[in-house]
Amino acid sequence: GTGASGIQIIGDIADKVGALTVFQRRPNWSVPLNNRDITEAEMADIRHRYEEIFAVCAQSNGGFDHLPDQRAYQNVSVEERRALWDALYDAPGFALLLANFRETFLEAEPNRDLSDYVAERIHARVNDPQVAEKLIPRDHGFGMRRMPMETGYFEAYNRNNVRLVSLLDTPIERITNTGLQTSEESFDLDVLVYATGFDVMTGAFDKID
C-alpha cells in the first residue's frame, strides 16, 4: 500500500536498499512536510510570539497555526491563486490543507483546480510522466481523504533502484515461496514489507514509563 505508512517507508529506505519494488493498490494525494532544523534566531522569535501563535491555534479548526484564506475563491485571479498555492506547498506542515481557500474543500470546481495544481507539482517532481500519472489519484479530489505528508517520496521514483507496480493494472494473485505473483509477473523478494499502519496518535503515550 501507499498510504501514510507506505509513503514514509518508501521515502526512508529508497536510498538504503539495492532494489525496491512498490506494489501500489491505489495512489494517495501527498504533499511535502518540509521539515527542517530551526535556527536559534527562529526559535527566539517563536518564543516571543507564543501568545500570538496560541491565539491562532485556538481559532483554527484543527488546533494548528494555520487559518483559512478569507478571500472568496471566485474573486481571486488565477495568478493570485497560483501564488498562494506555491507558497503553501513550499511551507512546512499542513499549510496547503489548512491555510487554503475555504471553497477548495467545499465546492467541486475549486477542489478540481487545486487537485490539478497538486498533480502538476507531482509531474514536476517525477521524471517519468507515466510513473507520475500512476502516482496521482483520479478517484477523489485533493483533501477529500486523510492525506499523508511526505519527505522525498516522489523523488524516490526517480532512482534507478525503485520500481512502481500499479496493482490497478496488474493485481496480486498470490504470495509465493520466494515473493509474490501478479497477473503479469513473478517477483522474487528478500523482504516483503506490509505497510499496514502504525500508532500515529497513541504510540508515544504507550511508551511513557
Locations of regions flagged by a protein language model:
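Glycine-rich Rossmann-fold phosphate-binding loop(s) that bind the pyrophosphate
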Residues: 2-4
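Aromatic pocket-lining residues of Rossmann-like dinucleotide-binding sites
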Residues: 9-13
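N-terminal FAD-binding dinucleotide-binding subdomain shared by FAD-dependent oxidases/monooxygenases
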Residues: 17-209
